[in-house]
Structures are given as C-alpha cells and as structure tokens.
Swiss-Prot record:
Residues where [4Fe-4S] cluster binds: 94, 129
Keywords of the record: 4Fe-4S, ADP-ribosylation, ATP-binding, Iron, Iron-sulfur, Metal-binding, Nitrogen fixation, Nucleotide-binding, Oxidoreductase
Protein source organism: Clostridium pasteurianum
Entry function: The key enzymatic reactions in nitrogen fixation are catalyzed by the nitrogenase complex, which has 2 components: the iron protein and the molybdenum-iron protein.
Any single biological process term in GO: nitrogen fixation
Name listed for the protein in its UniProt record: Nitrogenase iron protein 5
Gene: nifH5
Length: 273
C-alpha cells in the first residue's frame, strides 16, 4: 500500500487534481482510498457525484465515539473509498487535530485494508502547522506531491511545504515524489516549474494544462475521466496517474532561501528586477 499526501496552497486545485489523479489510477485497476484533510471537506465531492459527505468530526460530534465505518466511509466513482476528516466549529479548536482524530479513527475501524494499493491524503498546505503536517509527521504518508503553478504564492507555499518535509524526513520515512503543475497559463510556466523542482532536488512529475473541460466536469459533479474519458484532459490525468504509479524518484527536498527563490522568479520574469 502506497500512502501519498498531496499538498499545495489553498485554491491551487489540490482536490481537483487528487480526484482526477485517483480516477486515472482506478482506470489502471488500482484500489484507492481518499482521505480529505481540509476543513472545507470538498476533497471527495467529484468522486461522490457532488454529495457533500458527512465528515468524521461532524459524525463524532453528533453520534459520539460509537461510530461505524460505513457512516464515515462512502464508496464513490469506480469504488474509490472516500473519507472527509472535516474541521472544527469555526473559531473553536484546531483543524489539524481533526486530521489526527480522523486517521486514528480510520485505523481503529479497520479502513486500511490489505487490498488497498493507494491511500491519498488531500491536505491543506498554506499552513504547515503540526496538525496539517500530521500525515507526514506520524509517518502515515510515505510520499508527497506538491501541486503548484507558475504563480509566486504557489511557489512560496511549495517551498515552505518542502521545509516541512525536510524536517520530518529525518525522523520518519517521508519523501518528496515531485511537483505537479496545475497550469495557470503563466508565461514560462513549464520552464519555471521545472527549474523550481530541480532546485529542490526533485522533478516536475507532470504539467497539467489548463482546460475548460475541468470546469465542465466539475459543474456536472464528476471527474474529467468520468465526464468525458475520451477528451485530451482525461488523457493528461491518466498520464499523471501512470507517472505517479511508475515514479521511483523520492528525495528529501532541499528548500531554497528566500533570496534564491526570488532569483528564480526573476529569471523567469515573475518578479521585476
């Protein structure tokens, strides 16, 4: 079983990328569980046909400790198992704790079955606080992919996430598997992301082009592969799935200093000299 965490700044398209990637892996015959670790609880919406899944934390709040697995785990597209850890009530408590509670509960209830090929954790990545780092800190996820684009804030976040990975890689076995570019059609985007990934000692594992097909599929509450398996964008996600499945380059990243990051941004025209 490969346990994979997908990180990236809010709004970058982590959840969309994760759900489309897992659909691609399902097309390869893989058995998958997706654990949403974002308080927004939208990590499994497309796999479940738009159903807002009841989160682990909401279920615990309403039903107490005596929870059955089928009340928090739902099967979605292609039998992909879906869980949302959810978040605390606004203004109360720590969302990161919710992730810890959820993963512990899934373990107790026997969700990590032997037939699983992959478990994906879709994690909010703007804040690399202790709770959100939990899937890597506790050694749950062994490999991490960071979703980024050619925008400055996406790269700042990716660099910060790399610092978190570096910190926990020494104690646990977690490694960076690569950067996934979710294109924003920025000038020199491919070249910038490729240089950024290499600077970290990693790779740009796939460049996902921007496509109106993604929005169309989302409006229909489906992944692109379910909505139109023959379109070019579906093939992009299948290619991403193949690359992740075949990936063997797992590194402890070498995060950049602020100065070095800004140099790279200047080099590719994102920052003015």
């Amino acid at each position: 079983m490969r346990q994979v965490a997908i990180y990236g700044k809010g709004g970058i398209g982590k959840s969309t990328t994760t759900q489309n990637l897992t659909s691609g892996l399902h097309a390869m015959g893989k058995t998958i569980m997706v654990v949403g670790c974002d308080p927004k609880a939208d990590s499994t919406r497309l796999l479940l046909g738009g159903l807002a899944q009841k989160s682990v934390l909401d279920t615990l709040r309403e039903e107490g400790e005596d929870v059955e697995l089928d009340s928090i785990l739902k099967e979605g597209y292609g039998g992909i198992r879906c869980v949302e850890s959810g978040g605390p009530e606004p203004g109360v408590g720590c969302a990161g704790r919710g992730i810890i509670t959820s993963i512990n509960m899934l373990e107790q209830l026997g969700a990590y079955t032997d037939d699983l090929d992959y478990v994906f954790y879709d994690v909010l990545g703007d804040v690399v606080c202790g709770g959100f780092a939990m899937p890597i800190r506790e050694g749950k996820a062994q490999e991490i992919y960071i979703v980024a684009s050619g925008e400055m804030m996406a790269l700042y976040a990716a660099n910060n996430i790399s610092k978190g990975i570096q910190k926990y890689a020494k104690s646990g076995g977690v490694r960076l598997g690569g950067i996934i570019c979710n294109s924003r059609k920025v000038a020199n985007e491919y070249e910038l992301l490729d240089a950024f990934a290499k600077e970290l000692g990693s790779q740009l594992i796939h460049f996902v082009p921007r496509s109106p097909m993604v929005t169309k599929a989302e409006i229909n509450k489906q992944t692109v592969i379910e909505f139109d398996p023959t379109c070019e964008q579906a093939e992009e996600y299948r290619e991403l799935a193949r690359k992740v499945d075949a990936n063997e380059l797992f590194v402890i990243p070498k995060p950049m200093t602020q100065e070095r990051l800004e140099e790279i941004l200047m080099e590719y025209g994102l920052m003015d000299l």
